[in-house]
Amino acid sequence: MSSEGLASARELEERDLGATRDTEEIPSDEEEGEDVFDSSEEDEDLDEDEEEARKVKEGFIVSDDEEDDSSVKQRRRRKHKRRPRHEEDDGKLSEDDLDLLMENAGVKRTTRPETDATKGRFKRLKRAGSPDESEGQQDTDGRHENRLEDFFSEEEDEEHLGGTENRRLRTGGKDVLDELDDFIEEDEFSDEDEATRQQRRKLKEQRSKQSVQITGLSSDKIDEMYDIFGDGHDYDWALAVENEDDLENLDEYQQEEDDDETSDQKAKKKKITLQDIYDMQDLKKNLMTEEDMVIRRSDIPERYQELRAGLKNYGQLTPEDQLLEQNWISDKIAVDKNFDATYDISEFREAVGDAVRFISKENLEVSFIYAYRRNYISSRDKNGFILSEDDLWDIVFYDIEFHSIIYKRDYVKKFYEQLGIRDSLVDDYFNDESMTELNSLQDIYNYLEFRYAHEINDALLADSSSKTKKHLKNSSYEKFKSSSLYQAVKDVGITAEQIGENIGAETQIHPVVDHPNLKPSESISQILDAASADLQVFAKNHKLAWDTVQKYFAAEIGNNPKVRQKIRNDFYKYYIVDVVLTTKGRKEIQRSSPYEDIKYAINRTPGHFRSAPDVFLRMLEAESLHLMNIKIHMSSQEQYCEHLFQIALETTNTSEIAIEWNNFRRNAFYQALEKIFEDIAQEIKDELKKTSQKLVANSVRHRFMSKLDQAPFIPNPREPKIPRVLTITCGQGRFGLDAIIAVLLNRKGDFVKDFKIVQNPFDRDQPQAFEAVLDNIIQEAQPNVIGINGPNPKTQKLFKKIQEVIQKKQIVDNRGHNIPVIFVEDEIAIRYQSSERGAQEFPNKPTLVKYCIALARYIHSPLLEYTNLSEEELQSLLIHPHQSLLPRHIFKRALETSFVDIVNLVGVEVNKANDNPYYAKALQYIAGLGKRKAIDFLESLQRLNEPLLARQQLITHDILHKTIFMNSAGFLYISWNEKNQRYEDLEHDHLDSTRIHPEDYHLATKVAADALEYDPDAIREKEEQGAMSEFIELLRDDPDRRMKLESLNLEEYADELERSTGQRKLNNLNTIVLELLEGFEELRNDFHPLQGDEIFTSLTGETDKTFFKGSIIPVRVERFKHNDIICISNSQVECIVNAQRHLGVQLKRPASDIYEVGKTYPAKIIFIDYENISAEVSLLDHDVKHQYIPVDYSKDPTIWNLKQELEDVEEEKKISMAEARAKRTHRVINHPYYFPFNGKQAEDYLRSKERGEFIIRQSSRGDDHLAITWKLDKDLFQHVDILELDKENPLALGKTLIVDNNKYNDLDHVIVEYLQNKIKLLNEITSNEKFKKGTKKEVVKFIEDYSNVNPNRSVYYLSFNYEHPGWFYLMFKINAQSKLCTWNVKLTHNGFSLADYNYPTVIQLCNGFKTLLKSSSRARTQEASGSGYYGY
C-alpha cells in the first residue's frame, strides 16, 4: 500500500469519521462470562490507542445538530487565509456587465456600435384577442431579441471602460491624507516596537500616494464625517494593515526603500492582526473575528456560509450525485405532500431539481427564488406552487445534509480502496447509486472495522513514515477467528454472508447443511480435545466454549450489512411505539399533567406523530425525567423473527442432530436480531425526534410569521398614511393613587411628548376632572389612533372609560375622523420597558413611559419592533405551547426564516436604513445579507456620505458583489425623488422603487412601451439611445395605465421568451405589471388589534388550559353586594357568586355571616364573560368537590392501554385508602386492653410479653372494624378481625361484634368466650408430647432422623406454622421408606380443626388423625399428602 493510502487510512482513524456505535457489537463479558479472546494482554500504549480511537470514532456520522455545533467550533479553530484581490474581483462585475446594467437602467454610456446580432429581436406584446401582426413587423421586431442579455456576464471588454470608474476616481488626492496625518501623533502607539512602528509608518506613506475614494468632500467635511462615524471605523486602520493586498504592496514598497535590509531582519517583522490590537471578546461582540471577516468578503449569502461552514468541497458533486440529490430531496419532501397515487411526480422532481440548482450552484436565497424564479417552482398546467417557501427552506437544509452524506460516503469508499481488499458486500453497496442513507453507510463502516481489523492494523503498522500515533484495532473477533475454535462456526452449516442472501431473497437459495454425525456440543468437544494446548481455558468449561462460539456467530450475522438492511427496511414499514411507565411515572403522571395524554399510549405509528409531532417530543422529555420508557418494536415481532429464521437458517430434518443444530442456530440468530432491533430502534428514535422537531418548528414558524405579517395600523384605508399615535396605560390600575401615563409618537415614529394624568377616572365626586384632562391631551396631541394595554384587568375599565369620553365629547382628529381606541399586543413593550435598549434610548424616562413608547411603535410597525428584539428577548417570546421542546438553535432558525420571508416581502428602503438604526435592523434579513454583511453594507453606505440614487450604484460603488447583489437588489429599494436628478451624471430610475429586479428592467420597459402602444421603430430608437426608462415615466403619468397594462397578453409573451431564451418569466411579467401600477404595494395582512379572549389572556395571563368552565380556582372575598358575593381570583378576574351559589340560602343566613372579607375559598367556574373579564362561580361544596377536567385526547383501545390503566386505578385506590387510614384520627375505646397501635406497633409491644398476652387496637380495614393481636409464641402473633355492627356513629363501638362468624355483645364477651378459650387450647397443644418446637425445617429433620433410626415404626408430630399464625403442621411418616406427609390443623376457639372436623382436645385430635390415616389406603394417603384439601 502506498504511503498516501496509509496516511488516508490513518486519517480515517484520527478524524471525525469514526463510527458512532458501541465499542463491541457483541454482548458484554458480564452477560456471557469471561471472553477468552479479549485482548487485555495488550500493552498500555495500545490500550490508550484504543481509547483514543474510540473517542475519535464517536464523531463519525453525527446528527445535523451535532454537525452544526461542531462546524461552529471548527470555524473558530480554523485559520482562514484571506483571498487575494483577484479572487475577490471574481465576485464583481466586469465593465461589460456595467455597460449592460446601466443600459438596462436607462443611463447613457459611450458604447460600441451594435451589430445585427446584438440588436433586440423580441416581438412586442400583443393585446389579448388582437389579430396577429404582419410577418414584416415580426421580422423587424425580432431583431431586438438579444437585448435581453444577462447583465451579469463574466465576459470583459477592455476597449470600452465605462465612465463610472472614471467618475469614481475623479476626486481625492494626496492633500486629503496629508491633512488627516496632522491629527495622528507619533507617540499614540508608544508601546509598539520600532519595527512595528516603522512598518505602520511606511504603510501610511504608501497609502498617501494612492487616490482617495471620498467623492467631492473637503477636508473639513472629512473631519466632520469622522467625528460622526468615527465609532463605526475604530477597526479600519487595523483592517487595512491586515488586508492581504496592502501587505503585499507594503512588502514591495519596503523592497524598494530597503534593498539592503537582510532577510533575517525581514523575518523578525511581525504581521499586525486585529487580535493583536483588540480583545477577542470585543471582536466577537462586534463580529470582527477572522471568521467574521471571511464571511463579510465572500460573495456567498451569509446564511449559506454559516450553514456550509463545516462542509468540505461543497458544491463539487458529480452529475450522478446531482441527480441523486434531486431524487433524494424529492423523496424527503414528498412525504409531507401526500400526493395522490395518480399524481405525476416528474414535474415535482423537476421543480426540486431547479430549486437545488438555484441554491447550491447559483447561491440564490429562498426569498429570491420565491419572488423571481417563481415559474420554476410552479406548475405549468395548474395554478399554484409546487414548492412553497417552507419546502424551499427544507431544501436548503436537506442540501447541507446530502453534501455531508456524500462526503462521508466518498471518505469511506476511499478508505476501503486504500485497504487493498475486495469484498462483494462492500462493492455491491458502492455500486448501488441509490444508497444515500447514513444508516447504511454506518453499517458498511462497522462491517469493515469488524471483518478487517487485522488488515487495518497491518496498513497502519506498515506506514513507517508517519510520525503520528497509530490507533490500532483491538479485535477479539480476529483472535477468535484465528483460533481452532472457529471450526465450530464453520460446522454450523451456513455463513453469515449466505444468511444475508437468503434473507434478502426471502428463500433459502443457500440451504443449511447439518453436520453429518456430530451435535453442536460434540463438535465443540472434539475441537477442544484436538487443540487442548491452545484452548486450555475451555478444558473444564465447555459451556463457556459453547457460549463463545454462539456469541461470535451472532456477531457475524449482526454485522452483515445485507441482514441489517433487510431487517431495517421491514422494521421501518411495520414499527410501532409503546409507552412503558416507570414506577415514578405511574405515580407522578396524573390529571392535568403535561404527559397525561401519553401515559398509556400504545401502538402509535409514524402517522400519529406526523399529525401531532409534539407527542413524541413529550415522550422523550418524560423519558429523560425517568417517568417512562419508549419501546419501539415491530408489530408481531416474535412471528417475524421466527419467519426470518425459517427462510434463512432452519432445516427440515427431524433427526436429533438436526434439531440440536437448529436450536443452536436459532439462539445465535435471535441474539443477533436482538442487537439489530436495538440499533434500529435507536435509529428510528433519533429520526422521529428529528422529524418531530422539524414539524413543531414549522408550526412555530407559521405562528411567528402571523405576528410579523401585519401592516402598520391604518385608521382610514382611504388615506393610507402612518398615523400619529397616542398610547395609554394605567399601570397597576390603582386609580387615584397611581398616575395614568400617555405617550405621543409622530408619523415618523419619533417620540414627541409624554403626559401624566393624576385624576381618578372613576371619581364619583368629580367625574368631569378626568374627562377634561383627557380631552385636552387629545386636542394637543391630535392622534389618529389611541392604543392601550396594561398588566391587569383594570385596563379594561380604563379602555371603556376612554371610549365613553371620546363618544361623549365627540372628539375627532384634525381631519374630522373618529379616533379609534384599540388594544395593542404588549409582549414587546413588556420587554422594552426594562431592557438595556430602552435605557439607552430614553435614560431619563420612567418605565411606563417606555412601555407606552413600545406600544406606539408596535402600532407603527410590528415587524420592526420584532426585528429590534435581542436574541435573548426573541427566545423568551411565547409563540407556541410546545416551543420549549425544541433545541435553542432550531427555535432560533424557525424565527430567523420567518423574519427573512416577511422582511423580503416588505423590502427595505436603502437610504432610510442608512439614516435610521432602528429601521436598519431589518437589513440583516434581506436575501443575501446577514448580521455581518448588513454591518458591512451600512459602513459602505456611510463612506459614500451621500444618498444612494440608484440600485446600480450598489455595484458601481463596490458596495455589493455580484451574487449578493443578485439576491438582494429586488428587495432593496430607493424612493423616487426628482430632486436627486441634479446629483451626478446619473438618472434615477423609477424602477428602483419597485419590486422589479434589475435583471428584469429591460422586460419592464418593454412591457411599458407595449402598453403605451409605441411604434417598434420608436422603441428601437429609445433602446439604442439607452432611454427606455422614459416609457416607465410616461406610463406612470398615464391615467389609463391600469387598463392598458391589464390588456396585455403576458402568457403569449412569456411563451415567446421561453422559446427564445429558455427562461420562464410569466410570474416575473405579472410582478412587473403589478409594480408598474403601484411600486412596493403593501402585501402584508392588516394590523390585528387584540379582540375578545385575546384581551382576556393579555390582561390576566389565563388561557383556556388554566381558566375554563368547570375548573376549581381560589377566590378571595372582596365585598358583599345585596346577597351576592364579589370575589377576585389570583389573576385579578372579578368572580361573582350569586345568592344560589353559596350557603346563605340553604342556611337562611346572610352571606356576610358565613364568609369573611379577605379570606380565600375554593370556587368552581360556572360561566366566563371574556368581554368584561369576569366570571360566575360557585362556593357550594357539591360543586367544588366535582371538578370538570376536559379530556381532549382519544382513549381508543387500539392506541390506549385501557387494561393497564384500570389496573393502575385500582392499585391507586388501594394505596389511597391505606394512606387515608394511616392518616385518620385514632379512635378512643374505653377499655383497659385498648391501645392506639397499628399492627406492627402491637407486635413490638407484645414481643416482650408472655404467651397468651393480647391487646385490642384500631383496624386498618376501617372504622367499623377492630382487631385483637395476641402472642402465640416467640415472634409469632395472630391478628383477629372484629366486625362492628349497630354503631351509633363512626367512632362509637358497635353493639354487636362478629368474630369468626360468631356474635358477641361486647369486648369482654369476646375476650372470655373467644380469646381465653384459644389461649387454653394453645397451652394444651404445646404441652403435649407430640408437639415439637422449632421451624418446619427443624421438625422435618427430627422426623427423618427418627424414622431412619426406627425404620419400621411410624412417627408423627405437631408444630407451629410460622407462615400462618393460628395454624399447626401435623407431619408424619409411615416408615423409613415412605414419603413425609404434612397436614394442616387450625386452632379455633372451641377446639382443633382437621379435615373440616373439629376436635375439642388434643387427645381427640390425635385419635382422629389415626382414624383418618387407617381409613385411607397408602396410595390415597400419599396422594392426599401431596395435594389434598387438608394436606400440601
Swiss-Prot record:
* Lineage: superkingdom: Eukaryota
Segments of skewed composition (Basic and acidic residues): 10-24, 85-95, 140-150, 160-177
Name the GO cellular-component terms. euchromatin; pericentric heterochromatin; transcription elongation factor complex
Alphabetically list the UniProt keywords: Chromosome, Nucleus, SH2 domain, Transcription
By its UniProt entry, which CDD domains does this protein fall under?
SH2_Cterm_SPT6_like (cd09928), SH2_Nterm_SPT6_like (cd09918)
User: Acidic residues bias: where?
Assistant: 25-51, 178-194
Q: Name one Pfam family in it.
A: SPT6_acidic
A single MF term (Gene Ontology): histone binding
Job description of the protein? Histone H3-H4 chaperone that plays a role in maintenance of chromatin structure during RNA polymerase II transcription elongation thereby repressing transcription initiation from cryptic promoters. Mediates the reassembly of nucleosomes onto the promoters of at least a selected set of genes during repression; the nucleosome reassembly is essential for transcriptional repression. Essential for viability.
Name of the protein described by the UniProt record: Transcription elongation factor SPT6
Q: Which gene encodes it?
A: SPT6
